[in-house]
Amino acid sequence: MYAETDFLFALIKDDDWLGDAAETVYRDHRDDLWTSQFTLIELLLVAYREGRDSERVVTNAARLVDVHGDVDTVVAAATYVEDHGFTPFDTLHLVESGDDTIVSSDGAYEGVSSRLDLTAIDEE
C-alpha cells in the first residue's frame, strides 16, 4: 500500500485531523506500507511552509515506512533547511550537485558550494 503525504503527515503531526484514522491504518497495515522519495520531498515542502522542523518531519516519515528512491538526498536536504536556512529546492539542488560547481545567480550557495555566478558573466 502506497503511503501518500497526508497519511504520513497525519502520523507525524500531533494535532492533525486525520491522526486517529492514520494511526489505525498504520497499526493494521504497517508491514504493507511504503512510499517514495517524492513523498519525502513533499513533506519537506509542507514542513518548510508550515514552519515545522523539516529534518524531523522527513526523518520521522522515513522511519515509519519503507521508502523507494533516494532517501539520503532528501534527508540531507532537510538538514540544510534547518542548519543553514536554505529553501527546500535550493537544498535539493545543493545536495544533488555533490562536489560539482552550481551554475546559478542564487547567492544562497555562497560559502557552502562552488558557484558560477550567472550575474558575473560578461555577455559577448
Where are these predicted regions, by residue range?
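Short, well-structured N-terminal submotif of metal-dependent ribonuclease cores
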Residues: 1-34, 47-57, 124
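Alpha-helix capping/helix-boundary segments
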Residues: 7, 39, 73, 93, ...
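Acidic catalytic patch
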Residues: 14, 63-83
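A general structural signal for well-ordered alpha-helical segments in protein cores
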Residues: 19, 40, 58, 74-77
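Alpha-helix C-terminal capping segments
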Residues: 24-30, 43, 47, 59-64, ...
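Anionic, Ser/Thr-rich low-complexity intrinsically disordered regions
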Residues: 39, 45-49, 57-61, 111-123
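Acidic, PIN/NYN-like endoribonuclease modules and their adjacent C-terminal/linker elements
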Residues: 66-67, 94, 99-124
